[in-house]
Amino acid sequence: MNFNEFVNEVKDNIKLFLPKDYENAEVSTMECQKLNRAYTGLMVRKEGEMLTPTINLNQLYEAYKAQPGVTMETVCRKIADIVIEAPIQVDLKSILNYEDVKDKLFIRVSSAEANKEVLENAPHQLKEDLAITYHVAVGKDQDGLSSMFIKNDLLEQYGISAEQLHEDAMKSSPCVMAPEVSSIGALIDEMYQKNILMLTPDEREMLQETLQESSEMPTFFVVTNTDRIDGAGVIFYPEFMDSMGELLGNDFFILPSSIHEMLVLPDDGQVDAEMLRDMVKEVNATQVAPAERLTNDVYHFDTKDHVFEKADRFTERQKEKEAQAAKTEKAGKEQPDQKPKTKKHDMEL
C-alpha cells in the first residue's frame, strides 16, 4: 500500500472507530509546514469545534510499513484513540487576544536554511544560521506541551510589531520553559541511577564503561529546559550566555546538539574548533533524527565583547585584533625620538 492509498483508507474508515458523537464530524487532510518537517495532517472536527489536533499521517505510515503484521484496523484504532484522548480545550478568543497570550510566549530555535520556506511566513530573528521563532503554550500535561506557532497572519491579528513580540517572548520564555544546565556526566549518572534495576549485567557493564569514558572527556555542559524538549532556545534567553561565561570563568564553544539542547564547552585555548565541527557533523549524521537537527556548525561566545558568532568568525576576529595590535606596536616603535630643539639666540658674543 502506497502513502496515498494509506491516507484514503484512513479518511474513509476512521469514523467507524469513533464514538457516535463523531458521526457528523468533518474528516479532512491538509499539507502542514512545520519547523523542521512537512507532513500530511489528518483532522477530525466535530460540529462546533474551532480547534482540533492535526495528526501526522506520514509518521503513522512509516510505523505501519515498519511493522508488517499491523493491520489498517489497528492503525485506525490508534488514530481514533488520539482523536478521543487529545481534544484541544482552548478558548479561541483567548488565543487571538494578545494580552491573554503574552505571558505564555516562548521561543524555539531551528535551522534557518532547513526552514527557509516556513520562515518566510513567520516572524523570526536570525542568530547566525539559527532562527528564533515564537510560540504560544496552549496546554501542558504528562504527554508534553501543546503549542501554537505564531505566523505572520496571527501577528497581524495581535496588532503588534515583530520587535514587541520578540521582547515579550524573551521575558516569558524562562517562565514557560525553565532553563536547566547539567554536565554530561551528571546526565549519564542520572540515567544510570534510574535504569540500573532494569538493566541486564551486560547493559550495566556497558553503561559503567560509558561513565568511565565520560569522566575522561572534556567537561561538556548540556543546556536545555526542564522538560528537555525543544530546549535549544535556552541559550538565547536574556543574559544566559553572560551568566554561563561567569560560571565557567571563560569564553565557550556552543555545539548545536539538536533542537532539544545545546552543548557548551569552555574555551581554554586548547580546543580545536574544526575538530568540534567534525564531531557535530558525525553526530548529526549518525545519531540525530533529521527533524531534530539544527546545523553542522559550531558557535562561540566571547565573554569580553559579549558576542555570539560562528567559531570560525571568532577566530578571524582574533586574528584581526592581533594584527591590529601588532601594527599599533610597530608604529609606536618606529616613532622617532622627539629631541628638544636648540633655541637660536638673536645675538652671539
Predicted regions and their residues:
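Charged, alpha-helical interface segments at or near domain boundaries
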Residues: 28-222
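Basic, alpha-helical nucleic-acid-binding regions used in initiation and control of genome expression
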Residues: 2-3, 19, 70-77, 285-287
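Non-Sec secretion/translocation targeting segments of pathogen effectors
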Residues: 325-349
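A short linear hydrophobic-aromatic micro-motif
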Residues: 250-254
